[in-house]
Amino acid sequence: MEYHPQAIRLCALIFISFYALLHLVEAQDQKGFISLDCGSLPNEPPYNDPSTGLTYSTDDGFVQSGKTGRIQKAFESIFSKPSLKLRYFPDGFRNCYTLNVTQDTNYLIKAVFVYGNYDGLNNPPSFDLYLGPNLWVTVDMNGRTNGTIQEIIHKTISKSLQVCLVKTGTSSPMINTLELRPLKNNTYNTQSGSLKYFFRYYFSGSGQNIRYPDDVNDRKWYPFFDAKEWTELTTNLNINSSNGYAPPEVVMASASTPISTFGTWNFSWLLPSSTTQFYVYMHFAEIQTLRSLDTREFKVTLNGKLAYERYSPKTLATETIFYSTPQQCEDGTCLLELTKTPKSTLPPLMNALEVFTVIDFPQMETNPDDVAAIKSIQSTYGLSKISWQGDPCVPKQFLWEGLNCNNLDNSTPPIVTSLNLSSSHLTGIIAQGIQNLTHLQELDLSNNNLTGGIPEFLADIKSLLVINLSGNNFNGSIPQILLQKKGLKLILEGNANLICPDGLCVNKAGNGGAKKMNVVIPIVASVAFVVVLGSALAFFFIFKKKKTSNSQDLGPSSYTQVSEVRTIRSSESAIMTKNRRFTYSEVVTMTNNFERVLGKGGFGMVYHGTVNNTEQVAVKMLSHSSSQGYKEFKAEVELLLRVHHKNLVGLVGYCDEGENLALIYEYMANGDLREHMSGKRGGSILNWETRLKIVVESAQGLEYLHNGCKPPMVHRDVKTTNILLNEHLHAKLADFGLSRSFPIEGETHVSTVVAGTPGYLDPEYYRTNWLNEKSDVYSFGIVLLEIITNQLVINQSREKPHIAEWVGLMLTKGDIQNIMDPKLYGDYDSGSVWRAVELAMSCLNPSSARRPTMSQVVIELNECLSYENARGGTSQNMNSESSIEVSMNFDIGATPDAR
C-alpha cells in the first residue's frame, strides 16, 4: 500500500491541531489548581485575573489567623490584581495555611510576596517559610521593591498540606498569593527531597515572560539570549510537547545556536556552595527545516561529565534530557556544554533549560491518624488556640499548646502521648476523637464544664496511665472496665453528679480493684475542712494587718494615681518593705536628668546614676508603654529587698511616685554576659576559664533562690542578658520581675501563666503551665550552650535553628571542634569542655524530673573549672573564687530571707 506524502502531512497536521486543542481545554479547566488571593474578604467572590485568566479565590477558610492589608497606591500600577492585597500576621510565632491536596502527588507550589509599604513603616519584613514541619526558605523583603516569588516542587505524603509563615524578628510575616498546581507524577522525580526553583529559561530574544495559559502547569519561563555568542532560531510550525513535562509550544518555538558553525554552545551558573545538589532539565526540539544532507548531532556534558554522547533533537517534537540522580559542581560553578560531533553539519541548539536545587525535608509529619484525631477534637470543642496551627508535634519549638509528643527521630512519624485541655472552657461530652489517639499516656480534661457520662472507650486506649476528669459535671456511673484497668490513675473529684462507688471520686489509683473508703474519707474530709478553714481565717487576719501597715509605709503615692497605672494597682497589694525609697526628684538628680543611657529592656530604659555623689547605680525606669507593669515592679522590689547574696544583683532602693516607677540597682560596670560573648563591648574575648567562673557564680545565685529561700523562688527568665558582670567580671543574676515562689511540702509545681524568653523557655513548662525550679535549670542549660558555642540561641540559617538541637546534631559527629566557639582557638581543656557539654544537655532533658538540680549543677561546674585550672589557664581580671557553694534548706519564714 502506498501513502501519498500530502495525505501524511495532512494527518500530521490534524493530529497536532487536535493535541493543541486538547491542551487548550486542559488549560481552561484549571483542574486541581488552588489559587488564593491572600487578604481578600471572606465574602468576596472568585474572579479571573485579567493578565492570566486564572481564577483566584479568597483565602478565608484556609487560614485561621492574620489581618488583611493592601499595598500602597504608588505600587499598584506595577503589579497584577492578585498581588494588590495581602494578609499579615502580627500575632503568634507560626501561622499556617492548610490545603486539601491529593496524596502522593507532585505539586508546583508558589508563594508571592509584595510588601508595597502596606503598613506605612518602610520596614520590609524578614521571616521563615515552612512546608509542613520543615524549613523551606527564609523570605527577606529588604531591597525587593518588585516583590519576590518562592517556588518549589514537592510530593505530598498526605491529603493535607500546611504552608506556614514563621516570625523570626520584630516584623510581621505577610503573603499576597499562594498557588498550587498538580503535576504529572512521572515528571520532576527525585531520589530524595524536594525541588526548589533556581532558574527556568527559554532561549529567545523575545523579552516576554511566559506562563499560564501557554503553560498548562503555570510555570513561569523567562527569556535569555546572548546576542554576542548565539544565533536565534524560530519557527511558526506546531510543536508536539506530549512528553509529560509539556513545556509550552511558544517556549519550544525558539532556540539558540552558536554563531560559529564549529562552535560549542555553553551555559554556566553559580550555585550557593560546592555541596549544593541540583537537578537539571534540558528541553530540545528541532525547529529548523533541515536539508537532505543536513545533520544536527552533539554531545551533552555537565562539568565534563557525559550526559549524552550523540544526541539529535526530534523534528518538531519535544524531548527532555535530565540526570536521574542529583548533581554537584566543584566550587559551585556549573558549566553545561553542547559540543558538535564530527558527523554533524549543524551546530548544537538549546530550546529551554530548568535547574532546581534539592531541599531535604528530614522531619516527618506527625502520625496522620493522630493529626486527624486532634483536629476532630478541635472541631468538637471549637478550640481556636493560636498555637494550634501547622503540624501538632513538630518542629518542637512549635509544639501545640497542651500536647506532648514522642518524637524518637526524624525517620519516624511523631505520635501524641499527652493531651492537656484543662481549664479550656470545654462543654458537652468527652469528644469521640480522643479514642483515636491510640498512643495517649496522659489525658487531662480537668476544670471544664463537661457533662454526660464517662465513656468506656477510654479503657480501650491501652497506653493510658493518667486520666484527670476532676472539676467537671459528669453524671452516671463510672464504667467498670475503667475501674478495673490496671496501672491507671483516675482523678474524678469535683463531679457532684457522678455516682462513685466506695468514695472513688476522691481519688482512684488503678490497682485492679476498689478499696473500701466510705468511712475513712468522710472523716478525713471533715478534719481537712476544719484545718483549711482555720488556716484561711488566720491568714486573712495576718494579711489584713500587714496590708494596713505596709500601705502606710508606701505613702500616699499608691492612692493618687489617675492613669492606667492606678487601674493596674487596684488589685495589687502594697509593696511590703520599709527600706529606702527615693522620690522622683531624687531620681532625676541622681541620673543628672537621665543623661547617660546604659541600655533598654522590656521594663524600660536603664540610666547611669550616682547616690550621694559616691555610689554608682543603675536606674531602671518603667516605661508607660512597657509590657511589664506594677506587678513585676512590686515582685522585683520585694524579692531584692529580702534576699542578699553575692551572686544576685543588689537593690539600692526604688521610686514609686505617681506614674514614675524606678528600680535602683548597684552598678555593674561590665554590662551583661551576652554583650561580651557577641563582642559588642569590645576588648578581649572571654577565655574558657573566665566563662566557667561566670557560669559557676551565676549558678550559685540561682541555686540560692531555689534552696536558700523559703518559700523557694523560680527566676523564670534566666538568660545571658540577665547575667551582669562587675568591674572584676564577677557575675550576678538580675531581673527578677517574673520570679515566682513554688510549693514545698511534697508538691512539685505551681500552675501559672507561661512567662519567659523564647529559646530559653522550658518546653515542658510551656506545654503544661506547671512551673518548678527545673524550668530554671532548662534555661541555664541554654546559657551553658551559649558560653560553649558563642552561637545565637535561635538562628534560622543553621541546619537546626535552636541551639539545643544544633548541638545535639553536632554531638552525633563526635567532634568538639564543631561545637566550641572558634574564637577560643582551642585554648581549653577538652575534658572540661566535654563535662560542660554533657551537663548542658542533661539540663535540657525534655523531662524536668530527669534534669539535675542547681546544687548538682554547681558541683559539676566546679569540677569543670578544676579540670581547666589544672591545665594552667589564666583568668581575665577575675579574682579566684571557685569554692563550691551549696545552700541548705533552713525554714526561716514565709518570705525569702538572707542566708
From Swiss-Prot:
Residues spanning the membrane: 523-543
Family annotation (Pfam families) = LRR_8, Malectin_like, PK_Tyr_Ser-Thr
Q: Which GO terms describe its cellular component?
A: plasma membrane
Catalytic center residues: 717
EC main group: transferase
- Principal place of residence: membrane
Q: Which reaction does it catalyse?
A: L-seryl-[protein] + ATP = O-phospho-L-seryl-[protein] + ADP + H(+); L-threonyl-[protein] + ATP = O-phospho-L-threonyl-[protein] + ADP + H(+); L-tyrosyl-[protein] + ATP = O-phospho-L-tyrosyl-[protein] + ADP + H(+)
Regions of this protein lying in the Extracellular compartment: 28-522
Tell me where the LRR repeats sit in this chain.
415-438, 439-461, 463-485
Q: Which domain of life is it from?
A: Eukaryota
- Residues that the record marks as modified (Phosphotyrosine) are 665, 765
* Phosphoserine sites (modified residues): 751
Q: Which SUPFAM superfamilies match?
A: L domain-like, Protein kinase-like (PK-like)
Keyword annotations: ATP-binding, Cell membrane, Glycoprotein, Kinase, Leucine-rich repeat, Membrane, Nucleotide-binding, Phosphoprotein, Receptor, Repeat, Serine/threonine-protein kinase, Signal, Transferase, Transmembrane, Transmembrane helix, Tyrosine-protein kinase
UniProt-listed SMART domains: S_TKc
Residue intervals on the Cytoplasmic side = 544-899
Q: Where is the signal peptide?
A: 1-27
User: Under which EC number(s) is this enzyme classified?
Assistant: 2.7.10.1, 2.7.11.1
* Entry-annotated residues carrying Phosphothreonine: 583, 752, 757
Matches recorded under InterPro entries: Kinase-like_dom_sf, Leu-rich_rpt, LRR_dom_sf, Malectin-like_Carb-bd_dom, Prot_kinase_dom, Protein_kinase_ATP_BS, Ser-Thr/Tyr_kinase_cat_dom, Ser/Thr_kinase_AS
Q: Where do the record's glycosylation annotations fall on this chain?
A: 100, 146, 185, 240, 266, 420, 436, 449, 468, 475
The entry's localization annotation reads:
Cell membrane
Q: Which PROSITE patterns does this UniProt record tie to the protein?
A: PROTEIN_KINASE_ATP (PS00107), PROTEIN_KINASE_DOM (PS50011), PROTEIN_KINASE_ST (PS00108)
Q: What function does this protein fulfil?
A: Probable receptor with a dual specificity kinase activity acting on both serine/threonine- and tyrosine-containing substrates.
Family (UniProt) = Belongs to the protein kinase superfamily. Ser/Thr protein kinase family.
Name by which UniProt lists this protein? Receptor-like protein kinase At3g21340
Protein's organism: Arabidopsis thaliana (Mouse-ear cress)
